[in-house]
Regions:
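Ligand-binding cleft/hinge of the Venus flytrap
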Residues: 1-18, 22, 52-55
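Short glycine-/small-residue-rich flexible loop motifs, especially phosphate/cofactor-binding loops
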Residues: 4, 12, 30, 48, ...
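Residue-level detector of short coil/turn "hinge" positions at structural boundaries
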Residues: 14, 58, 165-166
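Structured loop/turn residues at beta-strand edges in well-structured enzyme cores
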Residues: 16, 36, 168
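Residue-level marker of alpha-helix boundaries and capping positions
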Residues: 19-20, 38-39, 145
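Pocket-lining segment of extracytoplasmic ligand-binding domains
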Residues: 25-117
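Secondary-structure end/capping motifs
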Residues: 83-163
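C-terminal solvent-exposed extensions
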Residues: 153-180
Length: 180
């Protein structure tokens, strides 16, 4: 959805100006690309850096940079749960904030060392390259606030993709009370 949104923002009609292959299992798109399917591919990490490292292609752009800040990861809870357990929501939010503070104040190498055990299948140099790329793209926000601008962008993308029938009011779904 984000890729097609970016194409449309740049005057490219995904339906008529190019062919997007969407019938390849998500887990093997990198292999299909390296094997000769397609001229470009959209990949998450560590696959994008893996293609580059193995000489199968180059990372030429980041959807996150070109789209604007899209809140890929959001955490949800029922209003009743938040009312009954505000201390849990606040503690969880503080934990996420500590992580953001860490990644925004430490080197790519330091971060890669800390997260390496979670990515046993990815060698250290690749992991460090990925973290460096995320740093250079400002992937990690400074805070946990889900802004109204990001919410509107997300709805624009969903609406453009045809999966959102009716827009929702920001205040009806988002609270920043635990982020302040």
């Amino acid at each position: 959805m984000v890729f097609e949104y970016i194409l449309k923002m740049n005057g490219i009609d995904p339906a008529t100006d190019l062919t997007i292959i969407q019938n390849i299992d998500f887990g093997v798109t990198a292999e299909a690309f390296v094997g000769g399917t397609g001229d470009y591919t959209v990949e998450f990490e560590p696959f994008a850096t893996g293609i580059e490292k193995d000489g199968g292609g180059y990372v030429i752009a980041s959807l996150g940079v070109d789209s604007g800040y899209v809140p890929y990861t959001c955490f949800s809870a029922l209003g009743s749960y938040m009312n009954e357990h505000p201390e849990i929501i606040e503690s969880f939010t503080r934990g996420i904030q500590k992580g953001l503070d860490y990644v925004n104040s430490h080197s790519s190498e330091e971060i890669a060392k800390i997260i390496q055990p979670q990515f046993e299948e990815t060698d250290f140099d690749t992991l460090k390259t990925i973290v460096e790329r995320y740093h250079s793209q400002d992937t990690w926000k400074a805070d946990t606030i889900f802004t109204e601008d990001a919410f509107e962008l997300l709805q624009n993308i969903l609406e453009e993709a045809g999966v959102l029938d009716k827009r929702v009011d920001y205040d009806a779904l988002v609270t920043t009370q635990f982020s302040k």
